[in-house]
């Protein structure tokens, strides 16, 4: 058998050795720090939920402010239209006085402005007498100003806010174990004997003897 010839390696072909060194403190901290890291993750999740809740509340406040401004503009426009109608529905009065030796007579003619011809306001023709005309004038001049209906909120946004608050309360809530009173065991105990005086015992023994006789 021939001899095994060892191949000589050059110094450049050799690979550097890897030396693994463990830090005992870091190793111990990693092995014993599971609870600590869990608490840190929980705190980070709670902070993230709080930030999201603040953003949702800010968006909701902005939407409410925009709705309020829109309602205010609509109300101002309605009031301006009412004032314009009041200015249009006017009456011209002409009065003429007649002087007599005994009394003074004043004749007044009232001519209402016809808005139905100009298609500004649809007035219905009067059916009754002067009382109906006065009622129509009052109803045309007085325009009720009712509050505009408030728009409903966004249901999806409110549901998201409620879910975020519920999860926040679930994280911050602590479980408390309550001890139930042992009423059943106390009820099974026999009643305690009360102390009696000598006179009471004599009376009881006397009654027992009489009953035996």
UniProtKB/Swiss-Prot annotation:
Transmembrane segments: none annotated. Pfam families: Nop25 (PF09805). Keywords: Coiled coil, Cytoplasm, Nucleus, RNA-binding, rRNA-binding. Residues 33-96 form a coiled coil. Signal peptide: none annotated. GO terms for molecular function: rRNA binding. One of its GO terms (cellular component) is cytoplasm. Residues 170-182 have a biased composition (Basic residues). Interacts with KIAA1191. Belongs to the RRP17 family. Multifunctional RNA binding protein that plays a role in RNA metabolism and DNA maintenance. Participates in the resolution of DNA stress and the maintenance of genome integrity by localizing to sites of DNA insults. Also plays a role in proper nucleolar organization by limiting nucleolar size and regulating nucleolar number. Mechanistically, regulates the nucleolar levels of fibrillarin and nucleolin, two key players in pre-rRNA processing and ribosome assembly. This is Nucleolar protein 12. It comes from Pongo abelii.
């Amino acid at each position: 058998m021939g001899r095994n010839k060892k191949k000589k390696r050059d110094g450049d072909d050799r690979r550097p050795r890897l030396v693994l060194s463990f830090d005992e403190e870091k190793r111990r901290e990693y092995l014993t720090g599971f609870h600590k890291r869990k608490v840190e993750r929980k705190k980070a999740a709670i902070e993230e939920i709080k930030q999201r809740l603040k953003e949702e509340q800010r968006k909701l406040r902005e939407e409410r402010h925009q709705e309020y401004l829109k309602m205010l503009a609509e109300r101002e426009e309605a009031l301006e239209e009412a004032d314009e109608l009041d200015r249009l529905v006017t009456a011209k009065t002409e009065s003429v006085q007649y002087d007599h030796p005994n009394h003074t007579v004043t004749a007044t003619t009232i001519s209402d402005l016809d808005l139905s011809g100009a298609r500004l306001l649809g007035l219905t023709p009067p059916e009754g007498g002067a009382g109906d005309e006065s009622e129509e004038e009052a109803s045309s001049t007085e325009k009720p100003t009712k509050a505009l209906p408030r728009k409903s909120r966004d249901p999806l946004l409110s549901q998201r806010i409620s879910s975020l608050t519920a999860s926040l309360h679930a994280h911050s809530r602590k479980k408390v174990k309550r001890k139930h009173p042992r009423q059943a065991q106390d009820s099974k105990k026999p009643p305690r004997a009360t102390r009696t005086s000598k006179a009471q015992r004599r009376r009881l023994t006397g009654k027992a003897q009489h009953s035996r006789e």
